[in-house]
C-alpha cells in the first residue's frame, strides 16, 4: 500500500485526513500548528515534524491549504521539491486561483511528479 502524506489539517483537511485513515490507508500528516494535527494520532496517523520528512516518506501527497500564498510557500519550497519521490503524485485540494494550480502543475510535471 502506498504511503499518503497530508499537508494542512485545518477545518477541511482534518476530516479529509481522518476519512482516509478510517479507510485503512497509512497516512503521515503535517500542519504548521502541530496541535491541529495531533488528534489524528488517535486514528493512526503519523505526525511529521517537517514538510521534507513528510514528502520523503510519501508516494502520494495531498495538500489542503488556506490560500495561494500558503500553497506557493509549500509547493514552491526547496524542502518540498527536493524531497519528493520521482513519479510520486501531488494532489492540491486547496482553494487557489487557476493560474496558481497551472504553474505548480507545470513545475511538478517538469520534475517527473504527477499533479
Outline where the language-model segments fall:
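NAD(P)+-binding Rossmann beta1-loop-alpha1 motif at the extreme N-terminus of oxidoreductases
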Residues: 1-63, 83, 87-88, 93-94
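Rossmann-fold NAD(P) dinucleotide-binding segment
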Residues: 51-63, 67-114
